[in-house]
Every structure is written in structure tokens, then in C-alpha cells.
Amino acid sequence: MFTKSERSSFKYWFAHWCAFQMTALNLKHWKPKYLLHDIEKPFLKLFWDYKKVQKWHRNHNSHHTEYKGQWDTYEMVIDWECSRFTKAEAQLNAYDTLVKMMRKEPDEKMRKKLYENIAPVLYDLNLCSLVGVNALYYNYIKNPN
């Protein structure tokens, strides 16, 4: 487990990379491209401080909601699901991460985008049931207040 202050280290990056690979394998959704998951981070860290690397990474990688193009929702969900294995402050699974994001998101369009793109992936990977998918819809889309 790593604290927030330790996340800029190579040791953390490698532990996260391993946890991501393990999670993708356990969910039976591993792809060869996942070998390159977050691969640029240790190299960028040689030139930039961690905050700049983090911002660049989130804006340029399709497994982050900050990415402006088409999201890679499976990689995103796997990333969320594995964070509890390496982040002391982020002990949520992928479903709970989505709930937290939807609860905090003030923009109705973004909540809808999150729901429409992520809920089917959670269900497909057996990370939530139809009851969980419906609960997301009723609590954060249909009746957000």
C-alpha cells in the first residue's frame, strides 16, 4: 500500500502496473496493449514534477475521464478496480468509484456520460448486478437530488 506522497515513485508505478495486469487477468479481459498501461509515467517523471506528469497523463490517455476523445472504458474500469491494491487512500472498487464520481459530479451531462459508458462495462465484467446498474440510474440520473 502506498500513501499519496509515495505515488510519484517508480516503486509505486511498478506496483500499480502489476496490480493492473493482475486485475485485467482476473477479470478475463487482459489485452496485449495493457502491457503499455501508464508506461510513459516513469519517463516523464525524469523531466517533470509529479503533478505535471499526472495532469499530462490524464489528458492524453483514454482510460481517464479528462481525456477529450473516445474513452477506453474497460481500461478505465480495470484501473479503478485495481487502485485499492496500491492506494492507501483509495480503497474503493470500480463500482464504488463510479458512485463517488457520480455523486460529486454537478454536470448532468457528465453524470449521464459516466453512467451510459461505465455501467455496462461494470455489468459485463461482473463487477455489479443489474440491481446495481438500476440503482445508479435511479439515484444519479432519474432522481439526482
Task: Give a label for each model feature.
Residues 1-145:
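Metal-dependent phosphohydrolase cores
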